[in-house]
């Protein structure tokens, strides 16, 4: 059933009140504190409708009502009025980054802290997947006999080392020529593009050094990144203890969620390719997250989407501030990551 404007007005007022006070909300509270323009009796009728439709649930001990996951979902999608961060708040966020050297790991660690402190939830950042990072420089070094060391310097500042065993002994001069050819042709591409597009095309062209085609496939396969190397940055456990202090089961659940790094990496990675800010509420997620909401957005290096960040907290989080916070932070991180990659 479509909600009327009266239903929407009262649902918004109730969710706003519950987020602010964290206790069930009754018709008297809505009448006294919100300019709804209805009598308490009319408000009670609308509240009963909203409960029947699945947007609210009763707390019989108090007589008040609380939002359900469906209620929160409608509130976030249709009712929330986004707060605009003030210049002072934006400058506070920017100041946190000016305290550090511009290195990727420091930026991402600081981002988790910023998100946590300004949202009163847990801040989380997923570092770039190695196969999405773009190549800045490659070097091949003869180690001994049939062993070559390949050094990959990525735009993010990550340095990867790979030992390759070949079918013959190559001189350092030959490896220098291959390295130069690869740098001229591979720079700026990510590992997926290098393996699946660029190197195959170079092998067809056959305009490289004499030794290139003999070792190209070995070099390409050796570039495979270990995606377990993806780093996870989390801050704000104290906020979660405070938010869920009266809800032991939900606290245990959210701590278990944060302890499952494999799940978190997989979960947030699903949003790297998605533009915009996403809100996942409770069972919207692909595992039990009752009472928990996640707000996430990606960040970019230039035009390339390389990672994700966000906040995890109670469903009663202040969405009108949390959503613009995540949005602004993702854009700021994208600017800084792009700057250090040049």
Swiss-Prot record:
The keyword Ubl conjugation does not apply. It holds the Pfam family HrcA. Keywords: Repressor, Stress response, Transcription, Transcription regulation. GO terms for molecular function: DNA binding. InterPro entries: GAF-like_dom_sf, HrcA, HrcA_C, WH-like_DNA-bd_sf, WH_DNA-bd_sf, WHTH_transcript_rep_HrcA_IDD. SUPFAM superfamilies: GAF domain-like, Winged helix' DNA-binding domain. GO terms for biological process: negative regulation of DNA-templated transcription. The keyword Repressor applies. Negative regulator of class I heat shock genes (grpE-dnaK-dnaJ and groELS operons). Prevents heat-shock induction of these operons. Belongs to the HrcA family. This is Heat-inducible transcription repressor HrcA. It comes from Leptospira borgpetersenii serovar Hardjo-bovis (strain JB197). The gene is hrcA.
């Amino acid at each position: 059933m479509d909600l009327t404007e009266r239903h929407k007005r009262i649902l918004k007022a109730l969710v706003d009140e519950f987020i602010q006070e964290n206790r069930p909300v009754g018709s008297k509270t809505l009448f006294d504190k919100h300019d709804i323009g209805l009598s308490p009796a009319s408000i009670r009728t609308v509240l009963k409708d909203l409960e029947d439709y699945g947007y609210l649930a009763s707390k019989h001990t108090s007589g008040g009502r609380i939002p359900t996951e469906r209620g929160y979902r409608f509130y976030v999608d249709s009712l929330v009025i986004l707060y605009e961060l003030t210049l002072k708040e934006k400058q506070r966020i920017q100041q946190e980054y000016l305290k550090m050297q511009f290195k990727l790991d420091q930026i991402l660690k600081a981002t988790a802290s910023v998100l946590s402190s300004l949202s009163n939830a847990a801040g989380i950042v997923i570092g770039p997947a190695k196969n999405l990072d773009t190549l800045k420089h490659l070097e091949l070094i003869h180690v001994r006999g049939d062993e070559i060391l390949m050094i990959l310097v990525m735009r993010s500042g990550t340095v990867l080392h790979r030992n390759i065993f070949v079918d013959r002994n190559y001189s350092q001069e030959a490896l220098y020529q291959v390295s130069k050819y690869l740098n001229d042709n591979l720079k700026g591409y990510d590992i997926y593009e290098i393996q699946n597009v660029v190197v195959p095309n170079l092998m067809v062209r056959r305009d490289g050094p004499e030794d290139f085609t003999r070792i190209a496939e070995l070099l390409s396969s050796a570039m495979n990144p270990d995606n377990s190397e993806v780093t996870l940055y989390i801050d704000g456990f104290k906020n979660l203890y405070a938010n869920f202090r009266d809800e032991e089961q939900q606290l245990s659940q959210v701590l278990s969620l944060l302890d499952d790094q494999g799940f978190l990496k997989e979960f947030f990675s699903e949003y790297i390719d998605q533009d915009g800010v996403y809100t996942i509420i409770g069972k919207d997620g692909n595992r039990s997250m009752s009472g928990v909401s996640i707000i996430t957005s990606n960040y970019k290096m230039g035009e390339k989407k390389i990672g994700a960040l966000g906040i995890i907290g109670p469903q009663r989080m202040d969405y009108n501030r949390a959503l613009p916070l995540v949005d602004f932070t993702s854009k700021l991180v994208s600017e800084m990551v792009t700057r250090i990659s040049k």
